[in-house]
């Protein structure tokens, strides 16, 4: 077959460019499937509301949707032309400007067919009846590819054994054995590709040089890296979108260019109170920036000598639970390109420790100025309790030609001590810009992601007097305290080469008498940013005991068939000093932990850095 | 006695899907006609004169606001080079609409349009919406394919036609928006035929009051 030859002639270097695209696509698909699942669930719920309930007689004269009784003369109801059910006047929807109506279920059914793309799959099935709806071309390519090439292609860092085991789990096998309309020969082609590649990687020396040629590092002067819409590193970023923590729901920055009816827009924000799509932001406002900023996070950017200041104000709106960062202007910035005296500055913010693209906000880019005025407000939806654990990173960048970025300076504002109630702190202030501060922190203790947890010490009424508990001398006040810990989720975990994890969390509370209480969360499959939302409850512990206890939380990637699970990272809370932990983060979580113990019956949110 | 229990923690799910629906669009055409440039112009408003031929496939996601709906577009940029054909054609089946591109300064790319169209017919669904785009209309001096020929071919194939320039940002946005609109139209049709009660009584995402784009052909 002619195609066979073309495919098997692909070089490893080419696959290195294609695979990240497939992974990114899969992340997009995952989000999409989740959305569709929700839409369908909602429709189902709507149907159930009208369904005949157990024991209740199906009165002929009642609305098929809300079960309200219908009268003989007044409020008789009318028959829906979609489903022929009689419904009351409340349960009709008039779509658009027409007088034709549908009952709520029919209307929603139609909506769901639009929103899920079902209409397309139905149409397509007329031509390709065997085509499944979910599996995209990319998913299939990826599947075949992974199935066959793991050993030779995937870099050896993640345990290749466990991966190949996982992928040959029964579910996967079944999927593979039913290629559902997928051109069988293409799968075979992949087989030949991979065998070919194995040979390549063993014998051919020029593979490495090819690699360089195709390398996705934007530092290479060639156009290619910039042209790729996402670098390799962006895979995780993308995947992260699948399950962003609820506690940090972003409001997409205002985009004045969007021709949105403000009312409608508001409505949409309310019904989907969540971040704007990652790659787009919904409008032109610098998706170029978002696309490459994954690179800037890992150090692929130029540095200018840092000068100047940024003027900003911080407000927290308790009503909407949003942090507003008003970026007014900068002055006296360094030139992004010193020789050409060029500077196109923009400002980017993160609420550290969240460095995911979810938590990124940017202003527009100003052209040719070192004293730009932005007047833009960047918003973060964040719970007040979360604020104390965050630091606002405000960095200024120059956007050069070919999307090259130059770092112009940053300021980091810890929010723990920020008084959002005080109006004087809400005024605009100038903050001097500094050089990148965090490099050393990141390199000295490798960050293995962050774990967000929420903890509460539950004490029965009467024993919550702190002094009593704190002393712990003589008679123990009570032993029936309870430590509740909700493991919300994790992000920035070291994912497998396919961009996902089958992760779970273990909690181990070591009491002063060395007794260990162990708990484990369920495994969340195939997610890069798992949201377990699982709670660990340690019963019968007193505050005094807890003060001398330590709680160790470890995140694992599950391996199938007895191959040992991979430890992704750990965080420790409690009395024992963590010898390995970085000083900064260690002391911070220590403070948080003390807060949990000293404020019984109150939830404390913590973001723990995994080591 | 100290003990430990696990329990599920119910919390409201975060929905991070701030859009109404998702369309998948494929850009095809010979190598170097400007597919990647066209997409970058649209998604990032950027253009670079350097030519980096696409390896395999790539995509971008952009959410637009159209007809009171947020539509998430997943736009696939395919490699024009023959060697990637197996991969790129695998994506035809998932696409609701196509942008078939040629270069007005390159006769060969225009002659290939018929073949590309056949590929669509072979690999895609029957109602695939296709826009024919003659790119690089900023290079009037080097033009070898007249607007007229472009339009005639489009008529012949049953596609809509635009001349555009990724470089000068001419008709780029219009092309995508028109494609979105025609997909929406197809969608309404498909839904209405499935629901006989509304045939004739248009509803939902109707675009009848959508006026034609300002200038379909290049003004330069
Ligand atoms: N003058 C002019 N040049 C353009 C235009 N669009 C693209 N180009 C140039 O044409 C060359 C090819 O553009 P690409 O977008 O990479 O071509 P492609 O169709 O993606 O090519 P493949 O990836 O190989 O399929 C580049 O040098 C672009 O700068 C345009 O509208 N006007
Ligand atoms: Mg290209
Ligand atoms: Zn009713
Ligand atoms: Zn009905």
From Swiss-Prot, chain B:
Region spans: Disordered: 194-220
Modified residues (Phosphothreonine): 86
Primary gene name: Rab3a
Protein name: Ras-related protein Rab-3A
Residue list for modification Cysteine methyl ester: 220
Annotated GO biological process: acrosomal vesicle exocytosis; axonogenesis; calcium-ion regulated exocytosis; establishment of localization in cell; evoked neurotransmitter secretion; exocytosis; insulin secretion; lung development
UniProt activity-regulation remark: Regulated by guanine nucleotide exchange factors (GEFs) including RAB3IL1 and MADD which promote the exchange of bound GDP for free GTP. Regulated by GTPase activating proteins (GAPs) including RAB3GAP1 and TBC1D10B which increase the GTP hydrolysis activity. Inhibited by GDP dissociation inhibitors (GDIs) which prevent Rab-GDP dissociation. Interacts with MADD (via uDENN domain); the GTP-bound form is preferred for interaction.
Motif Switch 2, residue numbers: 80-96
Classification of source organism: Eukaryota, Metazoa, Chordata, Craniata, Vertebrata
Enzyme class, UniProt record, top EC level: hydrolase
Effect seen on changing residue 51 to L: Disrupts the interaction with RAB3IP
Domain text: Switch 1, switch 2 and the interswitch regions are characteristic of Rab GTPases and mediate the interactions with Rab downstream effectors. The switch regions undergo conformational changes upon nucleotide binding which drives interaction with specific sets of effector proteins, with most effectors only binding to GTP-bound Rab.
Chain sites annotated for binding GTP: 31-37, 48-49, 53-54, 80, 135-136, 138, 166-167
The enzyme's E.C. designation: 3.6.5.2
Domain of life: Eukaryota
Keywords: Cell membrane, Cell projection, Cytoplasm, Cytoplasmic vesicle, Exocytosis, GTP-binding, Hydrolase, Lipoprotein, Lysosome, Membrane, Methylation, Nucleotide-binding, Phosphoprotein, Prenylation, Protein transport, Synapse, Transport
Subcellular locations according to the entry: Cytoplasm, Cytosol; Lysosome; Cytoplasmic vesicle, Secretory vesicle; Cell projection, Axon
GO molecular function: ATPase activator activity; ATPase binding; GDP-dissociation inhibitor binding; GTP binding; GTP-dependent protein binding; GTPase activity; myosin V binding; protein-macromolecule adaptor activity
Post-translational modification (record): Phosphorylation of Thr-86 in the switch II region by LRRK2 prevents the association of RAB regulatory proteins, including CHM and RAB GDP dissociation inhibitors GDI1 and GDI2.
């Amino acid at each position: 077959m002619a195609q066979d030859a073309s495919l098997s002639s692909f070089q490893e270097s080419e696959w290195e460019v294609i695979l990240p695209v497939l992974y990114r696509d899969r992340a997009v698909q995952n989000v999409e499937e989740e959305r569709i699942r929700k839409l369908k669930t909602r429709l189902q719920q709507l149907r159930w509301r009208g369904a005949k309930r157990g024991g209740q007689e199906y009165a002929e004269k009642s609305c098929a949707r809300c079960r309200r009784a219908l009268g003989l003369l007044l409020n008789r109801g009318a028959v829906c032309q979609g489903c022929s059910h009689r419904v009351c006047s409340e349960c009709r929807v008039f779509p658009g400007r027409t007088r034709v109506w549908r009952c709520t279920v029919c209307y929603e059914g139609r909506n769901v067919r639009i929103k899920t793309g079902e209409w397309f799959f139905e149409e397509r099935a007329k031509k390709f009846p065997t085509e499944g709806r979910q599996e995209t071309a990319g998913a299939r390519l990826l599947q075949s590819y992974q199935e066959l090439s793991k050993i030779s292609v995937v870099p050896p860092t993640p345990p290749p054994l466990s991966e190949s085991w996982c992928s040959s789990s029964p579910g996967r096998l079944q999927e593979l054995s039913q290629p559902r309309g997928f051109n069988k020969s293409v799968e075979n082609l992949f087989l030949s590709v991979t065998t070919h590649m194995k040979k390549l990687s063993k014998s051919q020396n020029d593979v490495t040089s090819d690699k360089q040629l195709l390398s996705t590092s934007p530092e290479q002067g060639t156009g290619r890296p910039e042209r790729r819409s996402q670098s390799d590193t962006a895979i995780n970023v993308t995947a992260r979108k699948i399950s962003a923590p609820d506690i940090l729901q972003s409001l997409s920055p205002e985009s004045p260019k969007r021709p949105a009816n403000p009312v409608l827009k508001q409505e949409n924000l309310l019904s989907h109170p969540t971040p704007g799509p990652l790659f787009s932001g919904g409008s032109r406002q610098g998706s170029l920036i978002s696309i490459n900023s994954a690179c800037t996070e890992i150090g692929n950017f130029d540095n200018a000598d840092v000068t100047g200041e940024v003027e900003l104000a911080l407000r927290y709106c308790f009503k909407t639970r949003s942090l507003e960062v008003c970026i007014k202007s900068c002055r006296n910035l360094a030139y992004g390109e010193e020789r050409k005296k060029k500077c196109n500055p923009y400002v980017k913010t993160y609420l550290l420790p969240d460095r995911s693209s979810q938590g990124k906000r940017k202003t527009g880019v100003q052209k040719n100025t070192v004293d730009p005025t932005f007047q833009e407000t960047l918003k973060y939806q964040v719970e007040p309790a979360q604020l104390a654990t965050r630091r606002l990173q405000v960095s200024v960048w120059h956007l050069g030609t070919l999307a090259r970025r130059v770092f112009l300076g940053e300021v980091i504002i810890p929010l723990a001590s920020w008084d959002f109630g005080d109006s004087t702190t809400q005024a605009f202030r100038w903050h001097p810009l500094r050089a990148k501060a965090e490099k050393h922190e990141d390199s000295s203790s490798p960050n293995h992601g962050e774990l967000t947890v929420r903890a509460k010490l539950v004490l029965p009424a009467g024993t919550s007097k702190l002094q009593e508990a704190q002393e712990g001398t003589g008679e123990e006040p009570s032993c029936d305290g309870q430590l509740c810990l909700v493991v919300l989720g994790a992000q920035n975990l070291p994912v497998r080469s396919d961009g996902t994890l089958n992760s779970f969390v273990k909690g181990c509370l070591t009491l002063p008498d060395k007794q260990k209480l162990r708990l484990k969360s369920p495994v969340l499959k195939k997610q890069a940013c798992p949201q377990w939302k699982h709670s660990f409850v340690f019963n019968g512990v007193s505050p005094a005991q807890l003060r001398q206890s330590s709680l160790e939380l470890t995140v694992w990637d599950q391996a199938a068939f007895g191959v040992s699970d991979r430890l992704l990272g750990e965080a420790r809370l409690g009395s024992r000093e963590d010898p390995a932990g970085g000083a900064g983060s260690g002391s911070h979580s220590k403070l948080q932990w003390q807060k949990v113990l000293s404020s019984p019956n109150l939830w404390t949110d913590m973001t723990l850095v995994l080591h | 006695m100290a003990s430990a229990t696990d329990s599920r923690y119910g919390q409201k799910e975060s929905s991070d899907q701030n859009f109404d629906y998702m369309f998948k669009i494929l850009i095809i055409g010979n190598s170097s006609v400007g597919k990647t440039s066209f997409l970058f112009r649209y998604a990032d408003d950027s253009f670079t004169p350097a030519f980096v031929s696409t390896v395999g496939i790539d995509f971008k996601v952009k959410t637009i606001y159209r007809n009171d709906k947020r539509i998430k577009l997943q736009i696939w940029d395919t490699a024009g080079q023959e060697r990637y054909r197996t991969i790129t054609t695998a994506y035809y089946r998932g696409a609701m609409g196509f942008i078939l591109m040629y270069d007005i300064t390159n006769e060969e790319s225009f002659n290939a349009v018929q073949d590309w169209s056949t590929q669509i017919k072979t690999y895609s669904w029957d109602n695939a919406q296709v826009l024919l785009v003659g790119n690089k209309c900023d290079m009037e001096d080097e033009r070898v394919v007249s607007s007229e020929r472009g339009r005639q071919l489009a008529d012949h194939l049953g596609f809509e036609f635009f001349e555009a320039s990724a470089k000068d940002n001419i008709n780029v946005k219009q092309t995508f928006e028109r494609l979105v609109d025609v997909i929406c139209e197809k969608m309404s049709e498909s839904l209405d035929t499935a629901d006989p009660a509304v045939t004739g009584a248009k509803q939902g995402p109707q675009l009848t009051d959508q006026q034609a784009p300002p200038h379909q052909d290049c003004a330069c």
